[in-house]
Amino acid sequence: MDYPKMDYFLDVESAHRLLDVESAQRFFYSQGAQARRATLLLPPTLMAASSEDDIDRRPIRRVRSKSDTPYLAEARISFNLGAAEEVERLAAMRSDSLVPGTHTPPIRRRSKFANLGRIFKPWKWRKKKSEKFKHTSAALERKISMRQSREELIKRGVLKEIYDKDGELSISNEDDSLENGQSLSSSQLSLPALSEMEPVPMPRDPCSYEVLQASDIMDGPDPGAPVKLPCLPVKLSPPLPPKKVLICMPVGGPELTLASYAAQKSSQQAVAQHHHTVLPSQMQHQLQYGSHGQHLPSSTGTLPMHPSGCRMIDELNKTLAMTMQRLESSEQRVPCSTSYHSSGLHSSDGITKAGPMGLPEIRQVPTVVIECDDNKENVPHEPDYEDSPCLYGREEEEEEEDEDDDASLYTSSLAMKVCRKDSLAIKLSNRPSKRELEEKNILPRQTDEERLELRQQIGTKLTRRLSQRPTAEELEQRNILKPRNEQEEQEEKREIKRRLTRKLSQRPTVEELRERKILIRFSDYVEVADAQDYDRRADKPWTRLTAADKAAIRKELNEFKSTEMEVHELSRHLTRFHRP
């Protein structure tokens, strides 16, 4: 359909009078938002009959759109208000021209760098980097604030000072609560040292427990009845790296007073409310069946006290750690509950025995402290224990076996490295000996006499071949070797010189050759100047050719071409001569 050409202002009513409904819709799609909305929402009869007050009669400038087809497709979707607003928004986004209507907002053109912000966002990089620095600095500050010095830990009671003056030695109190509020791990077994302790409540941990004295449980209602341990939830975990184990003995008298025993008993009862109670005979069982399935061999009977000190703690720790590492992989199951009879309490370890007043006497109990790797900062250093007396829970044979196993574990990896690196040396060492090769008939068996005979045969062959060489006289007779005499050689040289000089003296000069006209080449009679008279510097008057020189050269060339130059008779007319 051909649209009428209008260069004047139109309103809604005049447009409907000129065009039908379809052409009016197409026309007003390119106009302002108000005109398009009125065209879409109102049927033609209503729009024609609408009152003049409802119609916006402000002039609208007609602007030609790029294409009408996509807008018609959008208009046919729906005739409700929401669809009309969506069509208006899409039309405004796709149009590059600004429609200066009162109800039409100006279209914001997209910059060519608009998509660059979606990909390249350096401000976010800076933010991420700063946040990362903040997190790391906060973590470092928190760790530094949590780390305390040795003096503060001694003041808090976590560590105890070591005195070497009067022979009194005290070790770190592992029963107190640690710095970060963590209790002892499942691998920490501790028999409480017989010293005054303050009952400190500890958080409930199913894997941490204390070992009480046998007399505490013997005071119960039925000392002869078997005591059952509650089932401990034990997780079968893969073998962990070996932990350092310290077995230290608190120094004290073999017999304690009733007051110290009562204080110890009250403190143990306060701690036992939050932990499992284990008998000393069960302590042996716990050492054999650890929380992770570890066998720790225990020594029966009272452990002897070493009077002058013990060996280096590192050796004991090393043997215990290697034993634990070896036995972790072998043990897979841990029994849930065990029962012991009261007879085992009296005869197993000899820890308690009846004393006067009917109260049991308490002997020294070794404290087994397994260092936990979780909280290394609050644990005293190993040199603090070097001078303290220790007790050994191993016999000499078991220690030797552990040391052998340790050495084999450490040397096996080294041996594998040596085997990998020195494979050539191993192959060379595996070479068969001479005797084996002789037995396999690879090398012939020879005695010393046979070797001497073989050498003599080779020598005779060489001498026979050397004797067959011709002598100098034979070579002279064959004219292969000429006899040399200095006088004769000098005479020959003189004769050669005389012959050459005679030939050179008989040579004709250039002038004689010119006169005889027997010059063969053009270069034979070219005069050569001496090096002293010749000057290679340019722009000298004697280096420039004059006109007469050039004419002489041209004449000489023409004569050469006409007389001396060999030219075929049929092509002689093609020879070019220089101007005279």
Swiss-Prot record:
InterPro entries under this entry? RPEL_repeat
- The biased composition feature labelled Basic and acidic residues covers 374-383, 471-494
Start-end of Acidic residues biased regions: 395-407
Q: Where is the segment annotated Disordered?
A: 330-350, 374-408, 463-494
Please name the PROSITE patterns in this protein's record: RPEL
Task: Provide the effect of residue 518 to N.
Answer: Does not rescue cortical neuron migration defects in PHACTR1 knocked-down mice
Q: Where is this motif: Nuclear localization signal?
A: 108-129
GO BP terms: namely: actin cytoskeleton organization; actomyosin structure organization; cell motility; cerebral cortex development; dendrite arborization; regulation of neuron migration; stress fiber assembly
Q: Sorted alphabetically, which SMART domains does this protein's record hold? A: RPEL (SM00707)
Which molecular function terms from Gene Ontology are attached?
A: actin binding; protein phosphatase inhibitor activity
The answer on whether this UniProt entry bears the keyword Nucleus reads yes
Q: Which residues carry this modification: Phosphothreonine?
A: 104
Regarding domains, what does the record say?
Binds three actin monomers via the three C-terminal RPEL repeats.
* The protein's role, per its UniProt record: Binds actin monomers (G actin) and plays a role in multiple processes including the regulation of actin cytoskeleton dynamics, actin stress fibers formation, cell motility and survival, formation of tubules by endothelial cells, and regulation of PPP1CA activity. Involved in the regulation of cortical neuron migration and dendrite arborization.
The record's similarity note reads: Belongs to the phosphatase and actin regulator family.
PANTHER family membership: PHOSPHATASE AND ACTIN REGULATOR 1, PHOSPHATASE AND ACTIN REGULATOR PHACTR
The protein here is known as Phosphatase and actin regulator 1
> What is the protein's species of origin?
Mus musculus
